[in-house]
Amino acid sequence: RANPKIDTDDYFLKTVHAFARKHKDKKIVLIGCGDSYVALISKHKAELDDNIIAPYIDFDLMNSLQQKETFYKLCEKHGVDYPGTFVYKNGMSMDFTIDFPYPVILKPSDSIKYWEHPFDTQKKVYTIRSRQELNSVIKEIYDAGYDDDLIIQDMIPGNDEYMRVLTSYSDKNGKVKMMCLGHVLLEEHTPHGLGNHAVIITEPNQELMKRVRNLLEDLHYVGFFNFDIKYDRRDGKYKFFEINTRQGRSNYYVTGSGFNVAKYIVEEYVYGKELK
């Protein structure tokens, strides 16, 4: 049953506690399907009932990874490419310069905070075609109440078919046990859904996956993750946009490829099996 208060701390805990008590003879796997829900689960892991399984990293690590600037520093450490990036900080002078041409991409560093402050022309990602438009949209975002950083990036040319998506699962010990790379053929093109994948086929790339494995295991990452990637034909490199600390909206491509995403959690946390 839908409730608009479910993404608030108190109501979330009240709802989860009630469900756990109602099913106290069962093991309950708690899965978040959006960034705000995943953050709530991670933040309150220690307060959850004993029969609830919450397969997520600690909140401090999750919160830092949600910040795109932190993620790009990790990319540099592990040789993972990402687009040319300028981080605009709230209150910064508007006379800054960027080292790449228009059009550019503009998006919030903290998407959870961003969606908490809706406005009529709000988009998930903006394609900005001039400096005048950039200044105008930045002002509009901050006037709506968002107060964190904004990410301005080089726009990588190419349509939906240049996109890739990488999903993985890491066990309790921080070891990657499953990786599945998908080649995106079509995305959604609505203001709030831009960038969500609609059609995907699997297409492995061992070198790319190896770099990501090293990054995740260095972090001792636990649970599902999802990367958005785009192939840059200008230099032949795959550029990483961000990490989602959860399974993706379109993750059925993983199950369809033979990796049942539910099975990994159930076998490890419910049946206590060691994943191969």
Feature locations, PLM:
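Active-site nucleotide/adenylate-binding loops and adjacent lid/helix of ATP-dependent enzymes
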Residues: 62-151, 172-173
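A short, GP-enriched loop/loop-strand-helix hinge that lies immediately N-terminal to
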Residues: 23-66, 81-84
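Glycine-rich, highly charged phosphate/nucleotide-binding loops
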Residues: 1-19
